[in-house]
Amino acid sequence: MISADIMPMDASKSNQNDDYSGTYVTSYATYVLTYNKSTNSIHEKAIYSDGEVFEHDYIYSDSYNGITYFDLDSNEDKGSIMFAGPGLMYTYDGSVTIRQ
């Protein structure tokens, strides 16, 4: 679990106001996502089990067959965050994790 000083101040309120913001926990990382409605983008803070922390920004890309895609906002790197529905994020191993 992550400490309160890592979680965005409005994460609990955001969970009720949009389909993406919140904390998603897997066996290897905790992801804190903050959705920006005005830019249709997501800021990700990933805290891995080994203590490494990475931050990335993603922009809305597409919705296809019920899956919503946000692509990494970078010219150098490629990556996506995918959602199966509100609060249901796909993980790198293909499983779905539920927003906490």
Region spans (language model):
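N-terminal glycine/threonine-rich, aromatic-flanked beta-hairpin/loop signature
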Residues: 23-66, 93
